[in-house]
C-alpha cells in the first residue's frame, strides 16, 4: 500500500483503478469514484467489495485506506481520535488524490464518519452507502448499551487474552465460520492484524463513538445526497431496526435494504448481496 503523510498521521491506501479507461483517475478527474471507510478492528473488511467481482470497478475508481491506528497507518496525536478527526483525514486523502467528489461507503463506525463527512463537506459527497452504521451518540441509553456489550471483550483483551477476545468478536460480527471466510476472501494475516488493531478500536474509537453527537438539524441543513442503508436482519439484533428508523427520521431520502440472516460485518459474510444492492442503487438513481 502507498502512504500519505498528514500533520499528525500517516495513512496507507490503495487505489483500485476502474477497468474502464474512460473512468480512470488522472488529469481529467471524473466523479466516478468510491471511497471505502472501514469499521472497527478489521481494517480490510471492505476489501471484498472490490475483489469479489468487477461489478463496481467496471465504472468506478475505488479508494481503500486504513484509518489512524490500523495496519501501518500511524496516529501521532496523544489524545483520543475523534469522529471529526477521521472526517478531516478522509477529506485530506481525497484532496491529496484529487478526488473532488465520491460515493462514500462506510461500514459501522466508518458509516458514522461518512455521515459526518457529508454534513461538514457536502460538496465532496455524491452519495452515502451506509453498511450497518454505528450511529450511537444520538441516544444516551442506547449508546451506553452498545458500549456495555463490548466491556467483557475489552477486559479479556486487556488481560492478555487477545486472540480469545477477538475470536468472540469475530463470531458475533461475522459468524462461527469466520475463520473460513477470512481465509478465503480477506488478505493474508487479517486475523493477526485485527488482534493488534483492536486496541485502537477498544481504547480510542469506542470513546469517540460515545462522545459523537448528530442531530436532525445537521442532517436537514447539509445532507441532501441519495442515501443507501444496508442492514442485516437477525432475531437477536434489534439495534439495526432502530437505526433504520433513526436514519429515516434524519434523512427521509434514505433507502433501506435488508439482508436476511446477515451479521454486522455483512460485507464479509454476504458480499454478493451487498455488491448487488450497491449496483442496483446506482442504477435506480439517475442522478448517480
Which residues make up each language-model segment?
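Flexible "cap/lid" loop of the alpha/beta hydrolase fold
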Residues: 115-119, 124-158
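Conserved HGGG/HGGXW glycine-rich cap/lid loop of the alpha/beta-hydrolase fold
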Residues: 8-75, 93
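Gly/Ala-rich beta-loop-alpha elbow adjacent to hydrolase catalytic centers
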Residues: 106, 110, 114
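Conserved acidic catalytic loop of the alpha/beta-hydrolase fold
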Residues: 84-102
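Conserved alpha/beta-hydrolase catalytic His-Asp/Glu region
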Residues: 161-203
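Conserved serine/cysteine hydrolase catalytic core
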Residues: 191-249, 255-258
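Short beta-strand immediately N-terminal to the catalytic nucleophile in serine-hydrolase-like folds
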Residues: 104-106, 131
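Catalytic histidine-centered segment of alpha/beta-hydrolase-like enzymes
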Residues: 259-271
